[in-house]
């Protein structure tokens, strides 16, 4: 466990610009130690990959564009410098993607469901997050979190994950901001219209939490992050709940919404 922890610390510290689609929390504050019990770290031998969300003891949800070879998942992490005694590491046993996902668009149907090689034990710093019972309404206040950049134009990453509150915005805001590409109906548009708070580099795959339910997956957004009228685009978890539940129940041929 000590060797795994040392490796994980080194990997988390090796953050870089390698993934142009990854996002981070800019304009936030340090999360409280028990505020992110469902937050997962994905990493491999090349470094930190993405965030993820624990939805039960055997399954994690993250962004499809976070997929990589030979990654591991780390649970219960708060500080990169101080070990939590209940931290746990797992390998993916199986990975599931939408079968109708466009192969030439890395953020199309940007969701990956991961079955763990063994169950994670709930603890002081580890607990699953509930799937949504209904979609969030425009204006809802939601929370983002992650170890991504705290200054969009500099390689500055926090020791502990940062959290920030943002709002669900009308889809038209994102369609106007990103008129050069399609903003899918199965996404959420979320942020602050005047800018200053946003997910940013290396927050990809992490959760958007509204009313203590798992509503969104960090997918993509403006560059640099946190600019006025350039909010983040999040996979709408509610639209994929039937697919998630079908896969967990053993129906590996389940399809995603169009």
Swiss-Prot record:
GO biological process: proteolysis
GO MF terms, alphabetically ordered: serine-type endopeptidase activity; toxin activity
Superkingdom in the source lineage: Eukaryota
Record InterPro entries: Peptidase_S1_PA (IPR009003), Peptidase_S1_PA_chymotrypsin (IPR043504), Peptidase_S1A (IPR001314), Trypsin_dom (IPR001254), TRYPSIN_HIS (IPR018114)
Residues making up the propeptide: 19-24
Occurrences of domain Peptidase S1 (ranges): 25-249
Keyword hit for 4Fe-4S: no
Xref: CDD domains: Tryp_SPc
Disulphide bond pairs: 31-163, 50-66, 98-256, 142-210, 174-189, 200-225
Subcellular locations according to the entry: Secreted
Active site: 65 (charge relay system), 110 (charge relay system), 204 (charge relay system)
UniProt keyword annotation of Ribonucleoprotein present: no
Glycosylation sites: 44, 121, 185
N-terminal signal peptide: 1-18
Enzyme nomenclature, EC number: 3.4.21.-
Family annotation (Gene3D superfamilies): Trypsin-like serine proteases (2.40.10.10)
GO CC field: extracellular region; secretory granule
Expression tissues: Expressed by the venom gland.
Annotated keywords: Disulfide bond, Fibrinolytic toxin, Glycoprotein, Hemostasis impairing toxin, Hydrolase, Plasminogen activation, Protease, Secreted, Serine protease, Signal, Toxin, Zymogen
Main function: Snake venom serine protease that activates plasminogen.
Quaternary structure (record): Monomer.
Family: Belongs to the peptidase S1 family. Snake venom subfamily.
Protein name as annotated: Venom plasminogen activator GPV-PA
